[in-house]
Amino acid sequence: MMVKIKNIIILFCIFGLLSNVSSLSSSSSSSQSSDNNGNLSPIQDYDLEFLSKHLTTKTPYWILTKNGDSNSQGDGSSGNSNSNSNSNSNSNSNSDSSNEPPEQCKLISIDFIARHGSRMPVLNSIEKLKEMTTSILEYKEQVNQGFNWIFNYSVPYPSDIAGNLILQGQYEHYNISKRLLKKYPLFFEPMKYKPQSYSITSTAISRTGISASAFSYGLLQGTGSLGVDGFQPVFIETASLDQDILLRFFATCNQYVDQLKNGTLINKDEQTKWNQMVFPNISNEISERLGLSDIWLPTSNVISDIFEACAYEISINNISDHWCSLLSKQNILDWEYSQDLSNYWLKSYGHEINYQIATPLLNDILSGFDIYINNNNNGSSSSSSSSSSNNGDNSGSNGSSGSGSSTSTSSNDNGSTNNNDNKVEPTSILRFGHAETIIPFISLLGLYKDEQKLFANSSTEQIENRKFRTSVVSPYASNIAMFLFDCGSAADGFKILVQHNELPVLVPGCDEIYCDYQQFKSIFKQGIDNFKWNSYCNINDDDSGSSGGDSGNGNGNDSHSKKSSYFLAIFIPITFLVGGTIGGIFTYFSYEKIMQVKNRKKLTQYGNDEFISSPKSKSFSFKPTKFDSRSPLIQ
């Protein structure tokens, strides 16, 4: 009996020991899981998902879904929120039955505009990061031990690859294209690649060109004939940096550039006012966390650099326990609003010029759709009513090649006109630019527009519930896609769907997400008709140089250039002839005058010895002095 009791006690002890081991293992696993969540410090009252969704234009690409940050709603029209996904794996399409096109509608053309993917810091940012820690180095002995890594910190971003696209940025575009292909297989699969059916353009910057390559590779993977994997090479067209009015309008509109540098038209003060309000408190908090209260306070520039260093560490290496560990949740939200104020007033709704300069891009998109519709006017009874607000003028003639040129080329390479029996193939227009491309273009469409303008002294409620957030509007690889559908009947005609970051959005002025194409065009018709690139963007220029077809599409520029070419072709030869004639006459009379002076001197010095008198004439002739090639008369 005693033996049995002893055995039972031993079993209970063993069971208890195993339970403790299991508990310790579970605790260890939980602790490890917490550590894997980014080694967040106690002051980091947020998780990595929050952090990676509030880095303004340094934010990794979002996958837009219905579950996520309630403060990140778009323009208020979709009613959907967002959740983050930075995975390099292929993600499922965010389809929803309510967002499916009407059953009778067929996708016939796509125009896709995207920002480049995640990148390295640009050179200027790298230089600032190198100087960031210099003011704190002398306080090494006083800094809290948890931050000793600061004194061994070196900027991990090589200057020779500054601004380059990183692998994550390539995957962002690769995965977007895969989801697009999965969403519309019937549109893409029958369409073999050729430059006439795929117009792919980027700015003349490597990160946008490589983004275009990554997107194209995902979209066309395995469809080519090159190599064992069926690689399909593509043609990517670029325009020179100083002439690209479609994707770099922010740099080629002289009026806008001048206002940014010197003008008072664009408000630059709101961000400064906000920083003056919140940065002193952030400075005190950072100093306290470092253990340097009353010893060292980071300046406004150092604070900005710390935020930027945090953003790059998250977006490039997913590191949160270095510079981000100095920042609380409220610090990050305050910095995010600081950046939003800058982008709002310099690139968005702060002033009309910020987004009106994106008009040529919108006009080029609609012109391309119109050309496609008019060349396929057998497909819908409503197509005969479709025409561009500028009769299909193609803005691609100045700057990046546009959709109009792409679609017309597919059937007009020989210069002949299309007839109704020869339909143009479906066309994909893919464009790759920058945050400065996306933000103004989204603003031109009226998306993410707050009822009241954003100011440094806006109410807390307005700041917290604002629609305009660059973390949502323009993260890395942000995109706007326009889908043209042929719905096949006079009642429905053609419809257009606009998506921002793969989520359908309701454009203000449209009755529904699948907006009637004519209605969509009418919303922007006046703005397109009234916008003249030359008169709007060229400083001290008037409308006379851009009259005619300059409806925001660059044709006025082209027309002006042609007129200048004709003028110069006539003026230069005439000037040369007149100038040469006058020069010859001047040289001749100068020569005669010099000879006369020389002869007078000789006559005075030698009498008439140099002259030969003619017995039959009272006039005199003389032996001319040979011209010296070194004479000052011959230059």
Swiss-Prot record:
Q: Where is this region: Disordered?
A: 66-102, 380-425, 614-635
Chain ranges passing through the membrane: 566-586
Please state what the protein is called.
Multiple inositol polyphosphate phosphatase 1
Q: Where in the cell is it found?
A: Membrane
Does the record bear Membrane in its keywords? yes
Tell me its EC number(s), please. 3.1.3.62, 3.1.3.80
Topological domains, Extracellular: 24-565
Catalytic residues in the record: H116
* Reactions catalysed, as given in the entry: 1D-myo-inositol hexakisphosphate + H2O = 1D-myo-inositol 1,2,4,5,6-pentakisphosphate + phosphate; 1D-myo-inositol 1,2,4,5,6-pentakisphosphate + H2O = 1D-myo-inositol 1,2,5,6-tetrakisphosphate + phosphate; 1D-myo-inositol 1,2,5,6-tetrakisphosphate + H2O = 1D-myo-inositol 1,2,6-trisphosphate + phosphate; 1D-myo-inositol 1,2,6-trisphosphate + H2O = 1D-myo-inositol 1,2-bisphosphate + phosphate
